[in-house]
Amino acid sequence: MSATNNQNAASVFGRPWIFIRGVPSMKFLPPEGPTEIAFAGRSNVGKSSLINALVGHKGLARTSNTPGRTQELNYFVPDGYSGEADDLPPMALVDMPGYGYAQAPKEQVDAWTKLVFDYLRGRSTLKRVYVLIDARHGIKKNDEEVLALLDKAAVSYQIVLTKTDKIKAAGVPRLLAETLEKIRKRPAAFPEVLSTSSEKGEGIEELRAAIELAVAR
């Protein structure tokens, strides 16, 4: 990643960020404007914690030890922009409901699933999805289903391993290589896997730079 990309990422993520909207269904989506970067993953994979680490604000995205807490598409943008057509923020981060939470009522799971899939298929300003994978568990069946959906919808995505501090450091390179091999033939997958630990702050700068590069493409 170039020094310029790192500087640009620092300029965006160095600003204060704010929560602007929770979206329980597609009709409540904000008007299409800034580029959107979304975060998908299984329940309790650490999406909210990773967003907080990215923007340097521990309390921005609500975190919980209870799987399935995030039930809406939650929108976050850098502060200081009016939102008018000539003063849009450079990007919006979207925290998506987690999938794969078996204890939630089926109707609730179905509603979350429909919201996520409709959003992924139909949002023209969505530039990239970061699919978070718990480093302790690897890619599961329902992760594969989401990757297949993204491939079918031709939505660019990149795999991000989370909670790498929970496994032995020596195992991280092997896990990165194994994960990359699993997605190698997927048409919409970006051919690089990132590793992060929100708790330790590891890989956060690299993820910021990757997001900035994706937005600039």
From Swiss-Prot:
Ranges where the EngB-type G domain occurs: 33-217
Span of the signal peptide: none
Residues that bind GTP: 41-48, 68-72, 95-98, 162-165, 196-198
Keyword Kinase: no
Cofactor(s) needed for function: Mg(2+)
GO cellular component, one term: cytosol
Residues reported in the UniProt entry to bind Mg(2+): S48, T70
CDD domains from the UniProt entry: YihA_EngB
InterPro entries recorded: G_ENGB_dom, GTP-bd, GTP-bd_ribosome_bio_YsxC, P-loop_NTPase
Keywords: Cell cycle, Cell division, GTP-binding, Magnesium, Metal-binding, Nucleotide-binding, Septation
GO terms classed as biological process: division septum assembly
An MF annotation (GO) of this entry: metal ion binding
Pfam families referenced in this protein's UniProt entry, alphabetically: MMR_HSR1
Its job: Necessary for normal cell division and for the maintenance of normal septation.
Family listed: Belongs to the TRAFAC class TrmE-Era-EngA-EngB-Septin-like GTPase superfamily. EngB GTPase family.
Protein name: Probable GTP-binding protein EngB
Lineage of source species: Bacteria, Pseudomonadati, Pseudomonadota, Alphaproteobacteria, Hyphomicrobiales
